[in-house]
């Protein structure tokens, strides 16, 4: 059994290439349509990870469609949801998703609740935001796969101290292992069939 199977049915993903600042600014309608289509295709997931790029910084958003909730996990510390370029676009896309009968909390209708999720804070001046995003994503998914009721309803979060070098090395090793064993086959081709929602 492949290692990724423990996450199957639990987590989904939006394509980070579709959520970069440049594309949001230049192709907002296409990005919104992509988000609606991807949410509908993955509405049975417990959560959907969105790695979004804000200028030269990466942050993680975790969408819980059934709760109308988005958690922002940012290694820069607390960031108001309004500072993310995707917020307005995502709110509109979620409304369209609800209109198309996507899974959501009927008590909130089209409203999206944005919440901050405490995260490890990267050292000032470091260029490790991508590794922090991956660490938070892997840790979140690991905990979610073990105890679905623990996140995010309870008081949950990460410590705010910087990651230790061995923790960053572990993230890199896990990612390399994932790509070499789950994504790329022996011939160097991608194993994932039909992975696009475009």
Q: What are these regions, as identified by a protein language model?
A:
Residues 1-5:
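A structural/positional concept
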Residues 7-198:
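Cysteine protease-like catalytic core of ubiquitin/ubiquitin-like
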């Amino acid at each position: 059994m492949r290692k990724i199977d423990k996450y199957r049915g639990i987590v989904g993903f939006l394509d980070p290439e579709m959520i970069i600042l440049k594309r949001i600014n230049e192709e907002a309608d296409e990005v919104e349509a992509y988000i609606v289509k991807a949410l509908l295709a993955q509405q049975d997931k417990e959560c959907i990870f969105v790695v979004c790029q804000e200028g030269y910084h990466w942050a993680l958003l975790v969408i819980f469609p059934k709760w109308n909730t988005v958690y922002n996990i940012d290694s820069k510390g607390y960031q108001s949801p309004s500072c993310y370029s995707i917020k307005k676009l995502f709110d509109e896309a979620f409304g369209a998703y609800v209109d198309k009968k996507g899974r959501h909390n009927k008590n909130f209708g089209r409203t999206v609740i944005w919440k901050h999720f405490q995260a490890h804070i990267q050292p000032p001046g470091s260029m490790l935001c991508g590794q922090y995003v991956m660490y938070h994503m892997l840790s979140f998914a690991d905990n979610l796969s073990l105890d679905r009721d623990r996140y995010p309803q309870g008081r949950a979060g990460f410590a705010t101290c910087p990651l230790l070098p061995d923790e960053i090395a572990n993230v890199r090793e896990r990612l390399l292992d994932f790509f070499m064993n789950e994504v790329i086959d022996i011939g160097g081709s991608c194993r994932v069939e039909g992975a696009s929602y475009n």
